[in-house]
Amino acid sequence: MSASRFIKCVTVGDGAVGKTCMLISYTSNTFPTDYVPTVFDNFSANVVVDGNTVNLGLWDTAGQEDYNRLRPLSYRGADVFILAFSLISKASYENVAKKWIPELRHYAPGVPIILVGTKLDLRDDKQFFIDHPGAVPITTNQGEELKKLIGSPIYIECSSKTQQNVKAVFDAAIKVVLQPPKQKKKKKNKNRCVFL
C-alpha cells in the first residue's frame, strides 16, 4: 500500500438536494429524517480505494443564495467537487449548468467534478409524484447528457436513504484525483504555411 495522501472533496449543489444526507449516509451509515440545512461538520478519515490509502477530507457547503459570498471560501485547495442535483427537481438539474459550473470554473478552474443525481429512491416512487404534482423526474439519459455538457468524467445516481451507490460516489471522487482521466489530444493543424 502506498502512503496516505490527503484529498479535499467539496460537495456543492442547490439547497435541499441531499448533499448533507449523502455525507451523513456515507460517514455514519445512517439516514437523517429531518431536513436541517447544512449541519455536517467537516469530516476526515482514512479510506482505502484500489490499494491506495487516502485521507479523505469532506467539506459540505450550503446551496442557498444567502451563502453565495461565503461558499467559495471552502473551494480553496479542493482536489475534487461532488456536484449534486436532485433526480426529482428539474430546477436543481438546470442550475448545474446555469449556476454551479460557472461558479466552480471561476473559483476553482481545472478541478475535476463528479456529477451526482441524488434521491434515486424517489424517482420511481409513484406516491411521491402524486403528493408533489409539480415534481419532474430526471432520467439517467438526461444525467448523462448533462455530464457531457459540463465535461464531467463521471455521472452517478445514488440514494442516501437506501445507500445505493453512495460509496461509489466517494470512491469515484478519490479515483478521479488519484488517476485523472487522460486529456484528449488536440488535433494538429496540418495546413501550415512554411516559408523557405
UniProtKB/Swiss-Prot annotation:
Residues with a covalently attached lipid (S-geranylgeranyl cysteine): C193
GO cellular component, one term: phragmoplast
Top-level taxon in the UniProt lineage: Eukaryota
Localization (cell): Cytoplasm; Membrane; Cell membrane
Coiled-coil portions: none
Disulfide cysteine pairs (residue numbers): none
Keywords: Cell membrane, Cytoplasm, GTP-binding, Lipoprotein, Membrane, Methylation, Nucleotide-binding, Prenylation
Database matches in InterPro entries: P-loop_NTPase, Small_GTP-bd, Small_GTPase, Small_GTPase_Rho
Motif Effector region, residue range(s) on this chain: 35-43
Amino acids binding GTP: A16, V17, G18, K19, T20, C21, K119, L120, D121, S159, S160, K161
Knockout-associated phenotype: Fewer and shorter root hairs.
Pfam families cross-referenced by the UniProt entry: Ras
GO biological process, one term: pollen tube growth
Gene Ontology molecular function, alphabetical: GTP binding; GTPase activity; protein kinase binding
SMART domains tied to this protein: RAB (SM00175), RAS (SM00173), RHO (SM00174)
Distribution of this protein across tissues and organs: Ubiquitous. Preferentially expressed at the tip of root hairs.
Subunit structure: Interacts with GDI1 and ROPGEF8 homodimer. Binds to SPK1.
Family according to the record: Belongs to the small GTPase superfamily. Rho family.
Function: Involved in cell polarity control during the actin-dependent tip growth of root hairs, thus regulating root hair length and root hair initiation.
Name listed for the protein in its UniProt record: Rac-like GTP-binding protein ARAC5
Organism: Arabidopsis thaliana (Mouse-ear cress)
